[in-house]
Amino acid sequence: PGYGFEALENMTRWDWGQDLFEWFEYYLQERGPKPSLDAQIQRNDGQWRVEETWPPADREPFTLDLSDCGNDGAFVGGGLSVVGGGQTVTVECPDINDDRDIHIAGLPTLHLSAVPTFDGGQVFIEMQDAMTGLRLGHATMDVRYHEGGYEPQTVIPGQQITMMMEFQGIDAILPAGNGLRFIFSDQGEDYLAPACGNACTVHILPSLSVFEAPTVERGPETILTVPQPQ
């Protein structure tokens, strides 16, 4: 779950050709009405809507301290959770939205406190709906780029750092009461394990880490009903 099957019934768009034709006519042939400049966004459950921009300008931050969550992983050297060498850590945050849906729209961040054991290594995070296991998105980062940017920095083994991780773009609904789950590892999706292998595990400190997601509230009036096959 989490790779589009849940949106299958609303995946086919029969009006793309019309949209492309209008753009071709106006911008290449210089005739006809100017197409609307907006974004058509599909939520993870398949629902379409129109936004002026994406991420939406009216987004509001939802902040979650992972210290309020429970974690289940391998514990070594002073009780820190370790990622890498085939080990994973799962952080469960069940009681975060008991009374309302959370609609994530944008690029969430997770500022992860970590202690590398090597000048190298990486952390991969998969975020899931804690109730259903539905994949919502992922993030990955090499510890040498923990502050961002394009140039690697030397990492001192044993020194605590904050990994400024950013998820791939997400537009997803988390139903009320379902909560979030974060699975930490050193590889996932099409990201291979680091070349340094088992030598470069990363100790993570969820209790000092913070997740933040851009959220919006959208009513039924924003839903875009698209043509469907008969």
What label would you give each PLM region?
Residues 16-18, 25-230:
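Glycine/threonine-rich phosphate-binding loop and adjacent beta-strand/alpha-helix elements that clamp
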Residues 1-10:
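Catalytic cores of eukaryotic secretory-pathway lumenal/extracellular enzymes that build
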Residues 11-15:
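Soluble non-cytosolic domains of exported or imported proteins
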